[in-house]
Amino acid sequence: MQMRPIRTMHALIAIGIAGLIGGSSARAEFKLRYPVIDYREFEIEHNGAVTFDKQKSGKNNNQSYPTEVEVGILPFWTVGIEANVEANPGENLHYQATAVESYLQLTPQGKYWADLAFFTEFEHPANRNSAHSVTFGPLVQKEVPDFFGTDTLHTLNVLFEKEIGHQAEAATPLFVAWQSRLRLHPLFEPGFEFYGAVDDVSHPGKLADQQHRVGPVIAGLYSFSPYGKIKYELGYLAGLTRATEKGAVRWRLEYELPF
């Protein structure tokens, strides 16, 4: 099959999903999404994040624990379902939302300058007084070999969010995530990452009122072939603006099993 029909089909599917589901206030999710599809692979993934700040700042102990199941059903398409448990500062943990996710890989891995995918997520909140939302945008990844003697991997997410329904707000939040890491060893890949959040792209306001974080991260994987593999990520993020907490710890643990 030629690449042009495939790219056309990808675009039509992406437009179709957006048209069907059509999008919650801006919230930072410390999770990087990757554009390369693992075809015929079953994945269980847990992410977690906890923030740190002064006790009465309203930014301390913000917790988020999304867990999801994903399946690579086609060479260019992965679908998943996510359950999110979280707690705002001063609150107890509660079930926040259920989300359905779609990853459409738009370019074959390694064929072009960078690998590209389109991500779409439809979220159904547990609270009936909250609006449904759709999150969408490009995922980009570039591997740079032999950068000063070491291979490096760079990943960028640019995601927009829209609420839908009669309770929806007009704002369009923007979430940006960037990660660069050194591919020293499959078990140990150190790097750094950035997470940014803007409440409304049409009215971004002052930089100090936006949420921006940066910090170190380590990632790696261990293979149990043919019984799958385990991946991990562990990072610390320092807040860069007055609207951001002073620090946050985030982690990711994932088990992948081919079928």
Named regions from a protein language model:
Residues 1-32, 36, 258-259:
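Cleavable N-terminal export/targeting peptides
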